[in-house]
Amino acid sequence: MNKIIFTLAAVMAMCLAACAQNDKGEKSMGNESKPLVVYFSATGTTARAARTIAEATGGTLREIAPRQAYTAADLDWNDRRSRSSVEMDDPAARPALKGGRLDVAAHDVIFIGYPIWWDQAPRVINTFVESHDLRGKTLVPFATSGGSGIDNSVKELRKAYPELDWRDGKLLNGASRAAIQEWAAAAAER
């Protein structure tokens, strides 16, 4: 009988040791959060980059969709009266989002993707940021563009939302799948 009790006690002790919290501050496999990859893509280019990032990081992919989709006429940057031109000329413009708020609570790292419009993030990105509690999150911008860089857009996001943890952004124009995967995996580790 004593052997049975001793054996049960030893098994219980091993179970407790296996379940005990790691006191070295390391994350256990079950507690790591997956990144959230959110993106706005009017033409599909940024969506392709976002899918690659989500695949590379094992992240959750979600679209930032405006309530009213952009038409080709809306995106005509040569027309000062086009919807995109009017929005970008108005720093207070906040296009409404389609659907409800996203659950960002379970994610520590959030990749935020967008096309560069007028050297900035489209105003729908401001709507997303202002509609979600992103404090304490690591925000990693990525973008696509026909000719502009990402630096000014990140500078403007940092200026508009200084309380948030914005990392340096990455322009993914023409980047290979392997290059995007390598960058995304490193950025998700931050």
List each language-model region with its residue ranges:
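Repetitive helical segments and hydrophobic/amphipathic motifs
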Residues: 11-12
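Bacterial N-terminal signal peptides that target proteins for export
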Residues: 1-8
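N-terminal beta1-alpha1-beta2 submodule of the flavodoxin-like/Rossmannoid cofactor-binding fold
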Residues: 20-108, 112, 119-121, 126, ...
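Short, glycine-/small-residue-rich phosphate/pyrophosphate-handling segment
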Residues: 140-176
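C-terminal motif of bacterial Sec signal peptides marking the signal peptidase cleavage site
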Residues: 15-18
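Conserved strand-to-loop "acid loop" that flanks and positions the catalytic carboxylate
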Residues: 114-115, 144
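A structural signal for short coil/turn segments at secondary-structure junctions
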Residues: 57, 132, 161-164
